Amino acid sequence: LEPQTRKLFEVCRMREIPIFTFINKMDRPGQEPLSLLDEIEAELGLLTWAVNWPIGSGEQFRGVIDRKSREVILFDRAERGRQSKERHLKLDDPELTKLVEGELLDKALEELELLEIAGSTMDLELIHSGGLTPVFFGSAMTNFGVRPFLDAFLQMAQGPVARNSNDGLIDPLLPNFSGFV
């Protein structure tokens, strides 16, 4: 984890600001997803809940499984900077076995089962208080996984709340209020 990431997480946790995590560059070699979740939990003191789960990584990255819908979003390798085309299939669609190697899909499903048994549970209150971070996997350079991240953020994030300042409580609905940074 980068030093600036650690500092940002520390400030967010101190102020009980929700943290949404996007694990990037799944289309490049890197750490195993389970060890990344362990690292976030151990080093940042945050519980994690994977919203989606990668099928493979690096050259073998094939897409993600959405845990809630049980839908597979397949990754189509695009040139750098270009948007990846996404293909959505249900987990039980027979065509999936033609598009994704069995061992990659089996490994992803085994890891998902492990998360269901031993991982954190989805808890919106804990997300809002900054104690649990929803985790998404993808490749920002090709925009793969970015849309589901943004959609889930809109569903899970709470609206603006009043904040204390040197001048007292600032209501986000005041006409002259423009933002809180």
Language-model features, listed with the residues they occupy:
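Structural and coupling elements of P-loop NTPases
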Residues: 1-181
